[in-house]
Amino acid sequence: MSKTVNAYAKINLALFITGKLPNGYHTLETIFAPINWYDRLTFEPSETIEMACTNAELPTDDSNLCIKAAKRLQTESGSQKGVKISLEKNVPFGAGLGGGSSDAAATLNALNELWELSLPSETLHKLATELGADVPYFLEMPALALGTGIGEELTDLQVAFPFSIVTVFPETAISTAWAYQNFKQNFDRLLPDAATEIQIVCETGDLGRMQQFENDFESIVYENYAEVKKLRDDFVEAGSGFTRLSGSGSAVFGVFADDEKATACYEAMRKRYPTSLTPKSFKMK
């Protein structure tokens, strides 16, 4: 028995870095939103745990999050079953879109089913958090969610995002570690109530309220990557009602209330860079 699934990417509508823990991790407050840009993973029975990928630049050894996820499941469950994972890689990496984390979450879910483990959601959440801060979001949430802690403490906001989203990867990879080492700390400021504000935005359609949503990586990224800053400016010229960097970059997204403007922007951007168009009220599941 084999199984094929889509592993969707995400953007961060807001990303506030709120502190630093003794272990070196940063705490944050973020609003996750899914986008219609996805990898496809096929899982087939095998004697061992092995992996193939359509992108030769992506390692398929023990450093890959999918392999790590499968081996963590083996250890946790005591299962001796194997799997061949075939990854059709479409979501760019080094983009701030969470592609690797989404692939890991898809692996946890798929193998819990295929290996007939029936591990409870609490155990899967623990494994997901060990793999990466974004992995629990992809494992558990269908759409808009508030992330706190290091991003693993999740609240399903239970509202549809009534706007189209155009997301562009400017073919520049940015290291998350570099971004965390160099962003401008401002832990003492007063933050908006992001969960309440995004719910109001979704109910009223008032995109203007989103201007208070910041991404704390933007200033350092725009200072050091002129092509990423130029992409932001291009979105504004295209009529985006809200434009931000996603994660630590380098992907930039624009939010549109007008479907025609969104489609026109998408058609123009995709001539230059890898681009996705996400319809209104999009959900991963």
Curated annotation (Swiss-Prot):
UniProt keyword annotation of Chloroplast present: no
InterPro entries, sorted: GHMP_kinase_C_dom, GHMP_kinase_C_sf, GHMP_kinase_N_dom, IspE, Ribosomal_Su5_D2-typ_SF, Ribsml_uS5_D2-typ_fold_subgr
Gene3D superfamilies hit by this protein: 3.30.230.10, GHMP kinase, C-terminal domain (3.30.70.890)
UniProt entry keywords in alphabetical sequence: ATP-binding, Isoprene biosynthesis, Kinase, Nucleotide-binding, Transferase
Protein name per UniProt: 4-diphosphocytidyl-2-C-methyl-D-erythritol kinase
Catalysis: reaction(s): 4-CDP-2-C-methyl-D-erythritol + ATP = 4-CDP-2-C-methyl-D-erythritol 2-phosphate + ADP + H(+)
Top EC class for this record: transferase
UniProt function note: Catalyzes the phosphorylation of the position 2 hydroxy group of 4-diphosphocytidyl-2C-methyl-D-erythritol.
Active-site positions on this chain: K10, D134
Gene Ontology biological-process entries: isopentenyl diphosphate biosynthetic process, methylerythritol 4-phosphate pathway; terpenoid biosynthetic process
E.C. code: 2.7.1.148
NCBIfam families xref list: ispE (TIGR00154)
Pathway: Isoprenoid biosynthesis; isopentenyl diphosphate biosynthesis via DXP pathway; isopentenyl diphosphate from 1-deoxy-D-xylulose 5-phosphate: step 3/6
Family the UniProt entry places it in: Belongs to the GHMP kinase family. IspE subfamily.
Lineage summary: Bacteria, Pseudomonadati, Chlorobiota, Chlorobiia, Chlorobiales
Single GO MF annotation: ATP binding
